[in-house]
Amino acid sequence: MAVPAALIPPTQLVPPQPPISTSASSSGTTTSTSSATSSPAPSIGPPASSGPTLFRPEPIASAAAAAATVTSTGGGGGGGGSGGGGGSSGNGGGGGGGGGGSNCNPNLAAASNGSGGGGGGISAGGGVASSTPINASTGSSSSSSSSSSSSSSSSSSSSSSSSCGPLPGKPVYSTPSPVENTPQNNECKMVDLRGAKVASFTVEGCELICLPQAFDLFLKHLVGGLHTVYTKLKRLEITPVVCNVEQVRILRGLGAIQPGVNRCKLISRKDFETLYNDCTNASSRPGRPPKRTQSVTSPENSHIMPHSVPGLMSPGIIPPTGLTAAAAAAAAATNAAIAEAMKVKKIKLEAMSNYHASNNQHGADSENGDMNSSVGSSDGSWDKETLPSSPSQGPQASITHPRMPGARSLPLSHPLNHLQQSHLLPNGLELPFMMMPHPLIPVSLPPASVTMAMSQMNHLSTIANMAAAAQVQSPPSRVETSVIKERVPDSPSPAPSLEEGRRPGSHPSSHRSSSVSSSPARTESSSDRIPVHQNGLSMNQMLMGLSPNVLPGPKEGDLAGHDMGHESKRMHIEKDETPLSTPTARDSLDKLSLTGHGQPLPPGFPSPFLFPDGLSSIETLLTNIQGLLKVAIDNARAQEKQVQLEKTELKMDFLRERELRETLEKQLAMEQKNRAIVQKRLKKEKKAKRKLQEALEFETKRREQAEQTLKQAASTDSLRVLNDSLTPEIEADRSGGRTDAERTIQDGRLYLKTTVMY
């Protein structure tokens, strides 16, 4: 990974040795050996140019770093001089870059500085250039010609066997030639990579997976895009293999790459694992720093730094990439800002420890702002009215608030210190209504992180409430005295309240002072006071997160509404579980009223938070918020009653439907039984019908047979009668002529034949 020149340790600066040149490339080559005095060797130290120069600190020599090889293959010119002649590397002063066919390794001359004004350009000609030279000198006369010649001859550079080729382990920044188009290389397989199927080819016995497909599956949500992946590959010195046309066609058909894409690259599994680990490692992300840290590093926004979350801008998150000079400058500025932020953080931690030490000296009863914790930089009389109080703490037990600009070096006796001390809860948190950003909601955070910080703040407030509930068991009583506090003018409010911003013509300084007096007659013990510590939840803690001055940006309303929902639920639970029962509480609730408007308060209104001697804008705002909370509670109760009624109605409907369903199911069962009985009867009837049909057919056949027998008997009887009647006639006719007898016999025979037939 490249680093700025200013950060390279001197151990990596290898002193140049006298070059020993050997060449056997073509006819007409001259082998020149020159000493360090005759030819200027490539300088590796930082150049004396005007801007910051970035170059790679890899060692130049391959094994012993003892000899630098320069092969001159061009003709014509005096090699070895300071001018860029035909066979020497163009590093000298006065002249230009190497001429003709010089085959110079750009790694050897990465930081040359032409003393004559035009030198320093390294040209690569002759068709065997290894890569695009890094032009890091002030005079860049021949850099364009060298880059054009190197890009045109990139195919031959990868297979060049000259001694001046790229050094081992050095990435080649020109596009390598694609894979050879052979059937073995074009055989695609679907392999399993981290639980997903990825297309792969086997090239020269090495399994290579499709880089764009692996990017879509595993890296898309980790980096900005595929260009970032290629930047990482260059930095990791990984050269992906370029697909040939047939492989691209196959990958398009498989859906591994999008239709219309005509190029693709392959990468080995080992290199992909290296790339994946680099993408998932937060300290190695290249590129410019995030936007929120750019504003932090600027000097005019240095006061934002203490409010940023630690870890958002760590030293490793913005590494110098070695690509541009601006990146190096940004990295230096970032390091300075980080160091300053660490100092500020250390000061804050020390101040917090001092605060807790002084708090323990004056009594360990630190109950939710008993140290005159104020709301909106006014007096903390709410806690005096509502919370069991502790023994009075002197104004000397104060600290310097580290988060207020302009108040970092005040003496302990300064009145601002006591005021700032009164803004701190026992667990080290500031009250959410104070006129400065909350430490858990940094100004430089995006809105998504604000939600996270708010949830963390609610969690911390719950812990504080539990501690307060544990301490409330034995509260000592204290006589209250009137307190008048003013905000010091040299601590301007970074975030004024909403009412101050909305009111035309108003200024934040108009509400800087609020005098709040409490009557000396109110000397009752803390046990007789209104029990706002119901279930260990103080009103102060309940309203955490509702003040709009701690919400950055346009998200104020959303977050305030969100927290109001939560707080209304808390108040609802409190009112349901522990109602106000003491007579003192009822009396004080009925007695107090808004003197400015003459309006009596409703019975359940939290009036101990109101003071008739003059309400500041923030107190008015909080009064409005409490009214809104009461309305929200009433609405929630009404909605809950409505929901209960609807539930009851739905339950009754459900029971009715269930009874109706059971009745219908019984009827259905009876119908099914009846149907089964009828079907059985039908089967019996069918069987009886079939038997009767068979009997009928049998009787019909018998009848027909009987009729035929009767007919045959009747025909034989008629024949006998005819024979008896014809016999006398025949005898009478015999006496007649023979002809008549024969005729009669024939007629009789015919008659007999016909009767027998019938």
UniProtKB/Swiss-Prot annotation:
Organ and tissue specificity: Widely expressed. Isoform 2 is found in brain, heart, kidney, liver, leukocytes and spleen. Isoform 3 is found in liver and heart. Isoform 4 is found in spleen.
Q: Which GO terms describe its biological process?
A: development of primary female sexual characteristics; negative regulation of cell migration; negative regulation of cell proliferation involved in contact inhibition; negative regulation of DNA biosynthetic process; negative regulation of DNA-templated transcription; negative regulation of fibroblast proliferation; negative regulation of transcription by competitive promoter binding; negative regulation of transcription by RNA polymerase II
Q: Could you tell me where this protein is found in the cell?
A: Nucleus
Q: Which ranges are annotated Polar residues under compositional bias?
A: 174-185, 292-301, 358-380, 387-399
Q: Where is the composition biased (Low complexity)?
A: 20-53, 140-163, 506-524
Q: What is its main location?
A: nucleus
Q: Where is this region: Interaction with SIX6 and HDAC3?
A: 189-384
Q: Which CDD domains match?
A: DHD_Dac
Q: A GO molecular function for this record?
A: DNA-binding transcription repressor activity, RNA polymerase II-specific
Q: Where in the sequence does UniProt note compositional bias of the Basic and acidic residues kind?
A: 555-564
- Region labeled Disordered — which residues? 1-105, 134-185, 280-302, 358-414, 474-532, 544-564
UniProt lists compositionally biased (Gly residues) regions at 73-102
Do you know which InterPro entries this protein is assigned to? Dachshund_domain (IPR052417), DNA-bd_dom_put_sf (IPR009061), SKI/SNO/DAC (IPR003380), Ski_DNA-bd_sf (IPR037000)
Q: Which UniProt keywords apply?
A: Activator, Coiled coil, Developmental protein, DNA-binding, Nucleus, Phosphoprotein, Repressor, Transcription, Transcription regulation
Region described as DACHbox-N: spans on this chain: 189-275
UniProt xrefs under Gene3D superfamilies: Ski (3.10.260.20)
Q: Where is this region: DACHbox-C?
A: 616-696
Interaction with SIN3A: annotated span: 627-706
Phosphoserine modification sites are 491
Q: Which residues cross the membrane?
A: none
Q: Name one GO cellular component term.
A: cytosol
What does the function comment of this entry state?
Transcription factor that is involved in regulation of organogenesis. Seems to be a regulator of SIX1, SIX6 and probably SIX5. Corepression of precursor cell proliferation in myoblasts by SIX1 is switched to coactivation through recruitment of EYA3 to the SIX1-DACH1 complex. Transcriptional activation also seems to involve association of CREBBP. Seems to act as a corepressor of SIX6 in regulating proliferation by directly repressing cyclin-dependent kinase inhibitors, including the p27Kip1 promoter. Inhibits TGF-beta signaling through interaction with SMAD4 and NCOR1.
Q: What is known of its domains?
A: The DACHbox-N/DD1 domain forms a structure containing a DNA binding motif similar to that of the forkhead/winged helix domain.
Q: Family assignment?
A: Belongs to the DACH/dachshund family.
Subunit composition and interactions: Interacts with SIX1, SIX6 and EYA3. Interacts with NCOR1 and HDAC3 through its N-terminus. Interacts with SIN3A through its C-terminus. Interacts with SMAD3 and SMAD4.
Q: What's this protein's name?
A: Dachshund homolog 1
**Gene behind this protein:** DACH1
